[in-house]
Amino acid sequence: MSVHINAPEGAIAESVLLPGDPLRAKFIAENFLEDVVCYNEVRGMYGFTGTYKGKKISVQGTGMGIPSISIYANELIQSYGVKNLIRVGTCGGYSEKVKVRDLIIAMSASTDSNLNLVRFQGRTFAPTASFELLKPAYDIAVEKGFDPKVGSIYSSDVFYGDDDEDWKKWAKFGCLGVEMEAAALYTIAAKFGVNALALLTVSDHFVTGEVTSAEERQLTFTNMMEVALDTIAKIEN
């Protein structure tokens, strides 16, 4: 048991999917896992464990933003021994290379957060995905015909910014999209020597202005879920 996760020892698998939305965690558990047990409801942040293709897998909601995912990633790793963490979430598209509903595999994550400037005393750390997860995830996505886009993303502390043009700079430097968690997840995974990856579905687009509904974001976008689950099943064979 940890501060924010009310699960007994052994209740959480070594491999965990991390959707930001706890209702997406519930959707994944109900639609993809078998023999499901809900191990956490603290603060409404659902956590479930079940099996997928015979493999024990957990799904834990994290909430939005770097502080929130940092809490859950730290507790999952330190209190429950989790070894593989795959974020399954949404992002805003920055690049014309991606379209709404495309799957992005985040190779690295830039950020405007000060988390690593504080941690590394003003020096820069480059948060990157674990190749041990990235390679099988890419191969699986290609096999499924999902045409994944692999590249860097931007993890922002700000959802409602003051500069409407700021995103163009990040797009110019190759960022495919923006979300709010991956830089922290990759940093924490590196700190503890475990594996992490972010699989993101483009839910809206800064270039085209296209958006998706809250219901669609919660109940669809299943490609990234399938890739994440099959990646875990593959690495645990």
Swiss-Prot record:
Organism expressing this protein natively: Clostridium beijerinckii (strain ATCC 51743 / NCIMB 8052)
The enzyme's E.C. designation: 2.4.2.1
Molecular function in Gene Ontology: purine-nucleoside phosphorylase activity
Keywords: Glycosyltransferase, Transferase
Residues annotated for phosphate binding in this entry: G20, R24, R43, R87, V88, G89, T90
Any one cellular-component term (Gene Ontology): cytosol
GO biological process, one term: purine nucleoside catabolic process
Active site, UniProt feature: D204 (proton donor)
Keyword Transferase: yes
Primary role: Catalyzes the reversible phosphorolytic breakdown of the N-glycosidic bond in the beta-(deoxy)ribonucleoside molecules, with the formation of the corresponding free purine bases and pentose-1-phosphate.
Record-marked site positions (Important for catalytic activity): R217
Subunit structure of this chain's protein: Homohexamer; trimer of homodimers.
Name this protein carries in UniProt: Purine nucleoside phosphorylase DeoD-type
Enzymatic reactions: a purine D-ribonucleoside + phosphate = a purine nucleobase + alpha-D-ribose 1-phosphate; a purine 2'-deoxy-D-ribonucleoside + phosphate = a purine nucleobase + 2-deoxy-alpha-D-ribose 1-phosphate
Domain of life the protein comes from: Bacteria
